[in-house]
Amino acid sequence: MKFTKSESNQMINLEQNSEAWHKHRNNYINASEVAAIMGLNPFETKQALFKRKLFKEKIEDNNAMRHGRRLEPEARIFFNEVNNMEFVPAVFTKDFMSASLDGWHQESNSILEIKCPISYNSPSWSNFVLNNEIPMYYYAQVQAQLFCSDTEKAFFLVYQTFQSSKG
């Protein structure tokens, strides 16, 4: 991995979850990895992240990740309909960092981060529901996404299939 300093961000034409996207991620610190580096990620330690980056290992897929990938397009459509906007997936780099955005809206200079939990029955998600507090490991991810995309605002959508845009 090599680190270079650039003055501005760059939008990269990559389809998320493609082989080229996985190769791209090996060369950067990704927004979704920032919480692990900071010791905030309950799902991956700094040591595990370092090993994965060093040996260019793919993240082991799990049920929660598959669930999120399956629902994310539906969630983005829901958000776009409710807000009368058109957020699109995008990948940005800035300096040695990269961010794969669930949604980017150029006109409003904003991003969309989507989470599709299987259940709210975890301490992090129950705290979100009860206190409207974004888990710190996702907050760190969103801050890195804002940095990479040079955007001013982020929307954080927590989506489950029973949601509807109807009043």
Annotate each predicted stretch with a short phrase.
Residues 1-70:
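Charged, glycine-rich intrinsically disordered N-terminal tails and low-complexity linkers that flank
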Residues 47, 76, 142:
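Generic structural marker for isolated residues within well-ordered, non-membrane alpha-helices
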Residues 64-87:
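Acidic-basic catalytic patches of nuclease active cores, encompassing PD-(D/E)XK
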Residues 81-167:
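Nucleic-acid nuclease catalytic cores
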